[in-house]
Amino acid sequence: MKKLLIVSVKAYQKYISPLSPPSCRYKPTCSAYMLTAIEKHGTKGILMGIARILRCHPFVDSGVDPVPEDFSLMRNKNTSKNAEKA
């Protein structure tokens, strides 16, 4: 199942994403975040990726938002604040 999810995201990155201009407000991009989340957390990573996509809109601050080590649907705010100070 994990491999199928990874292949699906990579297919999106290769064939669908290039059809529109870059618009992700975060680093890494939402699709790269989803890949990392699936690799780290298995199928739970899908939920993390979906939560990330739902946070990607103009009413939320942009910036660095890496996949947390522990499963969480919330933004990794500590890392984001530390990155802004650096």
UniProtKB/Swiss-Prot annotation:
Database matches in InterPro entries: Membr_insert_effic_factor_YidD
Membrane topology (UniProt): Peripheral membrane protein
NCBIfam families: membrane protein insertion efficiency factor YidD (TIGR00278)
HAMAP family xrefs: UPF0161_YidD
PANTHER family the record matches: MEMBRANE PROTEIN INSERTION EFFICIENCY FACTOR-RELATED
Family: Belongs to the UPF0161 family.
Name of the protein in its database record: Putative membrane protein insertion efficiency factor
